[in-house]
């Protein structure tokens, strides 16, 4: 643990905007960094903090304002849970995030690893982080043959991490493990010769680094076909708010086709569990539904739209100059 703490101070990542002992900023960053790279998160984080600098301000925000700033990051349930969690923290904890991992992990959208990150970075709580990067480091360090995501693998990794975590500098230790996974012990071509763990790494000594972590066999991703309608009228594209349960809930999107229109193109988008193949048709009138709103081009650029829908509308040659 001591070697890793020293390595992080000397070689680890520093200066990221959320690297402060502030539970709110740490929590927002940890949620954003789930399934999303640091380079992408930086700009979103800056805009989010400018709009919602405290958990109290976030808790008081309306859903659409939050979804608008989140649009493009994907995995939109994260944004919905972020808002729900902020409201619980303000209502039940006086706007102060709990210090213990167990209580943090009961909050909406916070799992064990995120809870450990918030607690260790903000309060110095002795708790290990086991995110995707750390899992890769540990599976190579101990040549874990159980596939990641299985009960056996997860149990081993958590037990190992709990034994390894520094009792005096848990936050720095966790940052070191995350930094090693992100910058040294990478998925392909790991830089083992500069890794502070190479002396103890079983995979390095076997020359089997890229065999770990062991993955579950990939399931073929199902394909879903859909037809959407662009309602164009009064120099606006008319969108509907997705209120039903689904990945785009809370966003403004193209309504599902309910009448024939002119075929103006298609787009595909990969979700975590399926691929969407969408065909888009144009109709030159307003929709009959009551929850429709007209969007100018500027509205579409700035609004809470799913990234693939926004990209299609703004790139369409058929729609250029018409809204």
Put a short name on every predicted segment.
Residues 1-14, 19, 182-323:
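Intrinsically disordered, low-complexity, charged terminal extensions of DNA damage-control enzymes
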Residues 2-193, 197-206, 210, 223:
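Catalytic cores of DNA base-excision repair glycosylases
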